[in-house]
Regions:
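N-terminal alpha-helical scaffold/docking segments in eukaryotic complex subunits
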Residues: 1-48, 208-218
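Alpha-helix N-cap/helix-start positions at coil->helix boundaries
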Residues: 3, 21, 36-37, 67-68, ...
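Conserved hydrophobic register position within alpha-solenoid helical repeats
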Residues: 6-9, 42, 73, 105, ...
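Structural signature of alpha-helical solenoid repeat scaffolds
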Residues: 11-14, 47, 78, 110, ...
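Amphipathic alpha-helical scaffolding segments comprising HEAT/armadillo-like alpha-solenoid repeats
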Residues: 18-32, 51-63, 82-95, 114-131, ...
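Conserved alpha-helical positions within TPR/SEL1-like repeat arrays
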Residues: 40, 44-47, 71-79, 103-104
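Long alpha-helical HEAT/HEAT-like repeat alpha-solenoid scaffolds in very large eukaryotic proteins
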Residues: 96-118, 129-136, 201-214
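Long, ordered, amphipathic alpha-helical scaffolds
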Residues: 148, 168, 172-218
Length: 218
């Protein structure tokens, strides 16, 4: 299969009717492709398969040598709330050396922890311990995402503070998080923060993110 056919196959994986056992066999082969981009796309597409081996494939990809592949695998594992996945993500939060991959591990860990109905107060303390350690801005942002998922009241306000980051990638992520995490009661605060950020925002990608997530603010 040449690269064009591989990419077409991976695009088709986002069609529910396409995600059969036969096609999972092809996906599993692409997850071992020599091209890390293909492996990463396979990890991202795997989330759409209900095949019993999907989880095992993603756990394997969390050990890939390429950061992007690991990041996509961590991201896709968010839909598997089970002890094995929770332990994998916990290990990644502590041991993952690349910030992008570590951030995705934190995001999925929070979702899996909530899905498992674990002791959220103990989980929140784990996150606060991580906040006391040196880490980059993207990891700090995702730690606040985790705390918000775990029920910490002021976490959404802390996330809004990242709208002032000098890094537009961080600002884009903050916009998406504010949308995802703001329920009906907290939506007005999120929208107010977005409108304030709009007064000084010039980056097209951030403006596009705001238009997507908060169309009423534009």
């Amino acid at each position: 299969m040449d690269e064009e056919h591989k990419l077409n196959f991976l695009d088709n994986c986002y069609d529910d009717d396409f995600c059969t056992g036969e096609h999972f066999t092809v996906l599993r082969a692409l997850a071992r492709d020599a091209d890390p981009y293909i492996r990463a796309e396979a990890a991202a597409a795997a989330v759409n398969f209900t095949h019993p081996d999907t989880k095992a494939l993603l756990l394997l990809l969390t050990r890939d040598e390429e950061e992007l592949v690991r990041a996509e695998a961590y991201d896709s594992l968010s839909v598997f709330p089970c002890d094995e996945v929770a332990q994998c993500l916990t290990n990644a939060m502590e041991e993952e050396w690349e910030p992008l991959a570590r951030s995705y591990a934190i995001l999925s860990w929070a979702d899996v922890t909530v899905g498992l109905c674990r002791d959220l107060s103990a989980a929140a303390e784990t996150v606060r311990d991580m906040q006391r350690q040196p880490c980059g801005e993207h990891v700090r942002l995702t730690l606040w995402y985790a705390l918000c998922r775990l029920g910490q009241e002021d976490a959404l306000t802390q996330i809004a503070g990242f709208l002032c980051s000098r890094d537009y990638h961080i600002r884009c992520a903050a916009v998406a998080f504010l949308d995802a995490l703001s329920d009906e009661a907290r939506r007005p605060m999120a929208e107010k923060s977005i409108r304030e950020a709009l007064a000084q925002e010039t980056a097209k990608s951030v403006l596009s993110a705001i238009e997507t997530h908060f169309p009423g603010a534009m």
